Amino acid sequence: PTYILGSLTANGRVILINQSGVIFGNGARVDVDSLIASTLNLTNQNFLNNMFSFENLGGSGSILNEGQLKAFSGGMIALVAPVISNAGTIQVDSGTAGLFAGDKVTLALDGNRLVKYTIDQGTLNALIQNNGAIKVAEGLVVLSAKGVEQVSKSVVNTGGLIAATGITEVGGKIILEGDEVTL
């Protein structure tokens, strides 16, 4: 797996892809405009065409966050894998925090803003576990898991904090999607 155990800072979009897994360890601090971390494959052609269609080519690992992931104002944090666990903090101002569990996930972006997402193909035992904190001011929080139809269920468990707040007309929005959602 890819281990982020220290600081990662960037003014632009950071994309981390490792089919063996991505781990943000306790004490990790990420400060970026936008972050996409995935254990699903993104082809070179799709990347060059700014098409973020991630697909499991077999044996995709999981994502674990025990650190602090923060996107600058208007940015995005997207974690894409069959199994995602957040025990740390994810924070975005005026943007999107999204955890997407499936075998094929497509993110449509306008700059660094998420404008649409689809889980095109479910996975066996899709799981999103949030025991940490996801904080979005004036933006969107999405936790979406999709299992293989008729074979398994997808699970979204959140024992942690999810907050989407805003002082504008739109305010904040939280979307929890899955066959089994536990708050």
Which stretches of residues belong to each language-model region?
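Extracellular and secretory-pathway beta-repeat/beta-biased strand scaffolds
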Residues: 1-183
